[in-house]
């Protein structure tokens, strides 16, 4: 299965499940909004003929890399990863990310929907709570900044 076929399959699942999404200008990324969180779906080639579908959400952005909050984010990764069965958390360049990887060639609708709700639930639950501890901004705050509202 190639990336284009995976994008088409995921789009079909989202439509059939009644999940509202927006597509990036290049047609390669889906964005879904859940509460104060945004969940993105990206597609990457893997090995010779496979596709990895990554469902991810920026839980917090703009964490000052030189701050105590950044150090604390790194220190919490293990606890966060142990607290959620399927979600993995990473910290990179001031962004705390929740992600879930799926294999495209065996993707089933239930798997994708579960991944979306697991990531959305984790991000929406943690964004406000961790913003106070780590600094940084939830997606909803960043989106308002970008739009100038």
What are these model-derived regions, one by one?
Residues 1-40, 91:
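Charge-rich, low-complexity N-terminal segments
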Residues 1-13, 61-75, 140:
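Short, basic/low-complexity N-terminal boundary segments at the transition from targeting/disordered tails
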Residues 28-30, 51, 96:
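Hydrophobic residues embedded in beta-strands of well-ordered beta-sheets
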Residues 40-64:
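A short acidic-to-branched-hydrophobic micro-motif
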Residues 56-99, 148:
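Short, internal acidic amphipathic alpha-helical interface segments
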Residues 74-81, 108-134:
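Ampiphathic alpha-helical segments that act as solvent-exposed interaction surfaces
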Residues 90-120:
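A short, solvent-exposed beta-edge/loop patch
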Residues 131-149:
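Short, highly charged C-terminal tails/helix-capping segments
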């Amino acid at each position: 299965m190639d990336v284009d076929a995976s994008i088409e399959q995921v789009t079909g699942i989202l439509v059939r499940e009644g999940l509202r999404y927006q597509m990036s200008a290049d047609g390669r990324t889906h964005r879904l909004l859940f509460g104060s969180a945004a969940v993105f779906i990206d597609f990457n080639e893997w090995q010779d003929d496979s596709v990895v579908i990554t469902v991810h959400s920026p839980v917090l952005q703009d964490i000052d890399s030189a701050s105590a909050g950044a150090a604390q984010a790194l220190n919490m990764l293990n606890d966060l990863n142990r607290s959620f069965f399927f979600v993995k958390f990473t910290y990179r360049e001031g962004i705390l990310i929740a992600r879930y990887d799926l294999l495209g060639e065996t993707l089933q609708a239930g798997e994708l929907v579960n991944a979306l709700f697991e990531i959305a639930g984790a991000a929406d639950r943690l964004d406000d709570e961790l913003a106070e501890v780590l600094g940084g901004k939830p997606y909803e705050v960043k989106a308002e900044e970008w739009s100038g509202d």
